[in-house]
Amino acid sequence: MTEYNAGKCDIAVIGAGHAGIEAALAAARMGLDTICFAINLDSVGNMPCNPAIGGTGKGHLVRELDALGGEMAKAADKACIQYRMLNRGKGPAVHSLRAQADRRKYQEVMKLTLEDQKNLRVKQAEVVEIRTENGAVSAVKTHTGAVYSCRAAIIACGTYLDGRTIVGDVIRSSGPDGLAAAKGLTPCLEALGLSMRRFKTGTPPRVNAHSVDFSKMELQPGDSDPEGFSFETTSPPENRAVCYLTYTNEETHRIILDNIDRSPIYSGVIEGIGPRYCPSIETKIMTFRDKPRHQLFIEPMGLGTQELYIQGLSSSLPEDVQVKMLHTIPGLEHAEMTRCAYAIEYDCVDPTELYPTLETKKVHGLYGAGQFNGSSGYEEAAVQGFVAGVNAALKLKGEEPMILRRSDGYIGTLIDDLVTKGTNEPYRMMTSRSEYRLLHRQDNADKRLCGIGLRIGLISRERYDAVQEKYAEVEREIKRLEKTHVAPSEELNAYLEEHGTAPVLSGASLAELIRRPQLSYEGLGLFDPERPELPRPVRYQAEISLKYEGYIRRQLKQVEDFAGMENRLLPDDINYDEVTGLRLEAREKLKKIRPRSFGQASRISGVSPADISVLMVWMEGRR
């Protein structure tokens, strides 16, 4: 291969999926000359698995990304076709927006956004080598011999890195959706000293809608009052499609069990570790033998296609078995399978090789993002891409890094989990991973994170000021509700008794009534004639603040206590071999992870409270 000097840039982003997009846009918007490389420009922003954005925990990530200045939420609001707020029957901490996307529209929106972005070039090429000088990134080389000098590189390869797809005994070197795998980069990364591992994920079959009997399924409409992902989306989104629910049955399970010896998962063909929270249908059947059925959601792939996605039927069984099991499912008895399910194995890095900035510890200027870091999911990838892009830009500008803490939200929690604890399987974000769920609601992400977005230059002063005014309006409304008293009346007490709560004997403020779990801000409007016209988000924030006041105060105290440990930093050059009294396991883990603070050190698996005490005493003595 003939090499040639193809030019230079500040930052090279390798991959144009959800991580690569956010990394490239963030870096370019911060003024850095950026090139984003994609194996195929027609796959920019592709959704090779479920055609949806958000979900439990994931919707929180999208809102937080929007509050920081990312793009996913805005693109989703332009491309999504059905919106549902999950967990409405539970507390506000776990309310999570999920929306079906028109996958091709989403790609179109994102590709055009990249192409129109100042300081950003998009190129179709496979990067096969990352070059270094004096331990730092110096250039990237493509499969055609083009060498681009650069000062930083961000790896956002998704499932393409040495990917292979598996359907029964048919194994192909391939990325998702039949696209080419990225074959050349893994040996280079190993030569740079990175610890690589092999993970696996999978996807279900797709079917033609014309061959489906929807009358045998349960309709799953969108919300009657849908809301979008982006805080900047002013007009309410529109539901333009519906989903359906059906189930597997004992005949489906019998076919799977009769052919389990042909499953690559159980025959040993698949070596990669799969996602715990998105198992294949054969894994579900083998693991939960007592369950007579499993849910399957039938989801549209977009408005311009008849293809449907069968969520819950991920598999790597042979194609003939897939057809048989598909035809046992109510409504799918005559379904025409347009694409068969497959598993895909790919290379990824041990995320404990990364700093919280997502820069690798072994190569200066080399960052990882998304599935390369061991996570799963579009949303998890997008937020990591953003963090990597921002930190690469800040480092090249000589500015302080952006390190999001667990107390800041779900993005900080995700990254801390990956770089501190590591993961032995594809990591998925869930609300249960956050210790501060009530503070980290999806509805207040703008309040929590817009200030950081302003500092890094990705949120405008105008938008920041609008957020401050929004929450000032919330405070004004809370004060008004505290001061507005309602006298006992026959009408009020009848309303209270109807809603299962005690009548008022000597009057009460509206705030006191809203604090009752049986009552709502909207419902009490009957007894609040002076109520001002307020936007829905302001009304909602006021109600949440009053209803959960005690819990919120308690969690804020926990954050305050947490900050003490996080603010006690450990020196970059600390030699843990010199710290006498540390247990061997703790010493090894601390040397590998190299935590930034006592807080991070305390969360490392294998480092006990006693080890932290030893470290604190040693640090005091060092002073």
Regions of interest found by a model, annotated:
Residues 371-379, 435-437:
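Glycine-rich phosphate/pyrophosphate-binding beta-alpha loops
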Residues 5-19:
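Beta1/beta-strand and adjacent pyrophosphate-binding region of the FAD-binding site
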Residues 131-147:
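Conserved beta-strand-loop-beta-strand element in the redox core of flavoprotein oxidoreductases
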Residues 7-8, 25-129, 144, 152, ...:
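Conserved N-terminal/central alpha/beta ligand/cofactor-binding core
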